[in-house]
Regions:
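Flexible, polar/acidic helix-loop-strand segments at domain edges
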Residues: 324-398
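A glycine-rich, coil/turn loop motif that links secondary-structure elements
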Residues: 132-138, 208-220, 438-439
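An aromatic- and glycine-enriched ligand-binding surface/loop that stacks and positions planar moieties
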Residues: 23-86, 156-164, 188, 192-197, ...
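Conserved, well-structured interaction surfaces
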Residues: 47, 51, 55-56, 83-155, ...
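Structural helix-adjacent loops and short alpha-helical linkers that scaffold large soluble proteins
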Residues: 127-137, 234-241, 413-420, 436
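Bacterial Sec-dependent N-terminal signal peptides
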Residues: 1-32
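Long, intrinsically disordered, low-complexity segments
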Residues: 21-22, 54, 78, 82, ...
Length: 534
């Protein structure tokens, strides 16, 4: 299969990317895209348009650091190395002209939306097979909803700012500069509707040929619809029923499509498990191109073996959120004194070979598997350390999140102690090696969600704190890390001290619940209004 990257009818010439299979290297080959008059003629044209949906995954500002600068505001993470603009974001002092790489997300998602609208505008009237037509229309609905779901939680609200401008295949060209809807609920309703349409048209995952692994399917559409409904429920509790409905569709799948929790959390995030029973939807890459996020998570400099960037590091608050015996803690966070293998070398963290290069004294290890082998560079990770693409899928939603979303909807809509919510949370706890003793309280749900999903690109701990109404209190507390003192004879760690590494911050829930829309987007629009307070 050739996976060509096509940037929409508005851009007629682009470097194409072809992907022969999910594990093979990407081949780069240029092609000139004819104008729209000559383009929408054949199934091959449609396939090129569908392949173009994946172009955003290769942008460092989108799937590298991108929205992680906003997640860096949470109490799970601190900026792992000096970065003034990042500190402004974390301290809720950013301007509309800042945003670091995150500002690239807004235009990238509207480009994705435009591509989806091109398909929805042109494909229905084409003389092609119904199978190809359904595939194309289903994927277009999926990626249009996907684009809005990437933006809505970070930039939209139910007042005073409103939602994200809605542009569909029916929006006249003269009216593309749409004003914002009065509420972000208009976006969430559209996302749910689009994902419903996608689910109706797309195949089940089991029906995908292996060369199409990574493309949308029914369960992925339903899962993102559930996430949109969960985010909408902070404004209107009726959406909790929608969350439960979509989660049940996934939970009740049978046969080859039945989803489950992969038994060993410590080995979940490995290439061989990219499409295990826990998979719902990820963005794929390889050693030539793809998402770069994983390489941002290890300490700066990669122990002299690979130039990882070290921008996001775990807090002691996150480390302590895990209960004693929780296997997720040591599978997520590398603590001084523990060992990992990195590019074939045994790293006794904090002791050899180059100590600790992290603000918090710890580093994330959740996504380190692609870097373990001595032969990893050029095979499982990009040889260019400024482009840390790798073979591990960048998880955006997995089955554990589906269980947690349903449990949350049950607790918030039917009350703490809900029997079904207990069972769902205990499934999560059992896999983590913990007693199955959840009482399904709101506090327990929040902590299970924090520990299970820590540092995954989506969903966002910061957005969770905002929608729960917990952000102001959480961010009023300082954050902590650790300082390691080695024995004078060089034989190991003498002692570890807890230290404050980030001062308390002022979070104004009337302003900081959303981020400023990039000033470049405001300046090129007559109708787009800035979020208040920025």
């Amino acid at each position: 299969m050739k996976l060509h990257i096509y940037k929409g009818i508005c851009s007629f010439f682009l470097l194409a990317v072809s992907l022969s299979s999910c594990q093979d290297f990407l081949e780069f080959e240029p092609y000139g895209l004819e104008g729209s008059v000559n383009f929408w003629k054949t199934e091959n044209d449609v396939q090129k348009a569908l392949n173009a949906f994946h172009e955003f995954t290769y942008k460092e500002g989108v799937t590298g650091r991108g929205l992680m600068w906003f997640e860096n505001c949470s109490d799970n993470i601190v900026t792992g190395r000096p970065q003034a603009e990042a500190d402004q974001i974390k301290n809720f002092q950013m301007s509309a002209g800042n945003g670091r790489d995150a500002k690239e997300t807004w235009p990238a998602m509207f480009q994705l939306n435009a591509k989806a609208n091109d398909v929805l505008r042109n494909v229905p009237g084409m003389a092609i097979s119904e199978e190809m037509k359904n595939k194309a229309i289903g994927q277009a609905h999926f990626y249009r909803a996907f684009a809005y779901l990437w933006l809505a939680p970070f930039y939209g609200d139910n007042g005073p700012n409103g939602g994200i401008p809605i542009i569909t295949e029916n929006t006249p060209t003269a009216e593309l500069d749409q004003p914002r809807p009065s509420s972000v609920l208009a976006n969430y309703d559209m996302i749910i509707q689009d994902m419903e349409e996608a689910g109706n048209l797309l195949p089940y995952f089991s029906q995908l040929p292996s060369e199409d692994y990574g493309r949308p399917h029914k369960a992925a559409a339903w899962a993102f619809a559930a996430r949109a409904a969960l985010y909408a429920a902070q404004y209107d509790a009726k959406y909790y029923n929608t969350v439960i409905d979509y989660c049940d569709r996934i939970i009740n799948l049978t046969g080859e499509d039945k989803r489950g929790l992969y038994p060993d959390f410590s080995r979940l995030f490995r290439q061989e498990n990219n499409f295990c029973e826990e998979y719902v939807f990820s963005l794929l890459g390889n050693a030539i191109e793809g998402p770069k996020f994983h390489g941002m998570s290890f300490q700066n400099g990669g122990w002299g073996l690979y130039n990882t960037w070290g921008y996001f590091q775990p807090t002691l608050e996150l480390y302590k959120a895990y209960e004693k015996g929780d296997v997720r803690r040591d599978a997520t966070i590398l603590y001084p004194g523990n060992h990992i293998t990195f590019v074939g070398e045994d790293i006794h963290f904090g002791v050899n070979p180059s100590g600790i290069s992290s603000t918090s004294g710890m580093t994330f290890r959740k996504f380190i598997s692609s870097w373990e082998s001595r032969n990893s560079i050029g095979n499982t990770v990009n040889p260019n350390s400024n482009n840390s693409s790798n073979v591990l899928g960048m998880v955006l939603i997995r089955y554990a999140d589906v269980l947690l979303m349903k449990a949350e909807a049950l607790i918030w809509s039917q009350g703490e102690g809900n029997t079904e919510a207990k069972a769902l949370l205990n499934r999560i706890r059992k896999r983590a090696g913990l007693p199955e003793n959840s009482q399904a309280t709101k506090a327990q749900l929040k902590n299970e969600r924090r520990c299970e999903l820590a540092f995954e690109f989506q969903p966002s701990r910061h957005i969770d704190l905002v929608r729960w109404g917990d952000a102001q209190q959480a961010y009023s507390k300082p954050l902590h890390g650790i300082k390691v003192t080695l024995r004078t004879d060089g034989t190991g760690i003498d002692h570890i001290d807890e230290i404050e590494i980030w001062a308390s911050r002022t979070f104004n829930p009337k302003v900081h619940h959303v981020f400023p829309i990039p000033s470049t987007e405001i300046s090129r629009s007559k109708n787009l209004t800035q979020n208040k307070g920025y």
